[in-house]
Amino acid sequence: MASKSPAGGKKAAADTPAKPLLAADGIRKTAREMFYRDGIRAVGVDAIVNQAGVTKPSLYRSFSSKDELAAVYLRDYDAEFWGRFNAACDAHPGDPQAGLRAYLSGLSVRAVQNGYRGCGLTNAAVEYPEAGHPARVVAVEHKVELRRRLAAMAAEMGAPDPAKLGDGLLLLIEGAFVSSQLFGEGGPAARVADMADLLIDAHLGRR
């Protein structure tokens, strides 16, 4: 019997720190779904904890504020975006146009699905015009990096003005994010890959 007590004690000690982690994961998942669907400003802390089935103190033990939770959501969104973007590009080594087309072809499919609300980072930048807001900071950093990546890809394609082509591609992508929320299936977002090819070919002097 005496030998069971230490084992039981160890198990209890090991389980204790897992509880807030599980609560934090549930809060994070719930917040992501609600923030993306309804917008960050529209979703209150009470709604998040009710949906997640946790208490408000549980939320504040893991996240100091709703603003911090919003920033975490956007960092997760950023990581998911780059995971998808990089996978498309990596599938076409040495051919940046094909890699970009692969990403945009996937976007054109996602953009017409039910529940698609565009880019969570673009939406956050619109919701939070304040320059120093944590959500806007993450959104701006992401878009700056996307702009840089597109210009670098344009240079690899041999564009005479990589920055100009990169900016054109960025405008196309952002247009797809926004127009998808207006038109849905059959909207212009479905053509984003074809439009990108036309833009690239024009910049490279192809007929």
Q: What feature does the model see in each segment?
A:
Residues 1-22, 29, 204-207:
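N-terminal intrinsically disordered/low-complexity leader segments
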Residues 2-3, 26, 30-68, 72:
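Helix-turn-helix
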Residues 4, 134-141, 155-207:
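Hydrophobic/aromatic-rich alpha-helical bundle segments in the mid-to-C-terminal region
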Residues 28, 74, 78, 136-144:
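Amphipathic, non-transmembrane alpha-helical scaffold segments
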Residues 66, 77-81, 92, 96, ...:
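Hydrophobic/aromatic residues within well-ordered alpha-helical segments
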Residues 70-77, 84:
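Alpha-helical DNA-contacting segments of helix-turn-helix folds
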Residues 72, 86-116, 162, 166-169:
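Hydrophobic alpha-helical connector segments
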Residues 98-99, 113-134:
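Amphipathic alpha-helical segments used for helix-helix packing
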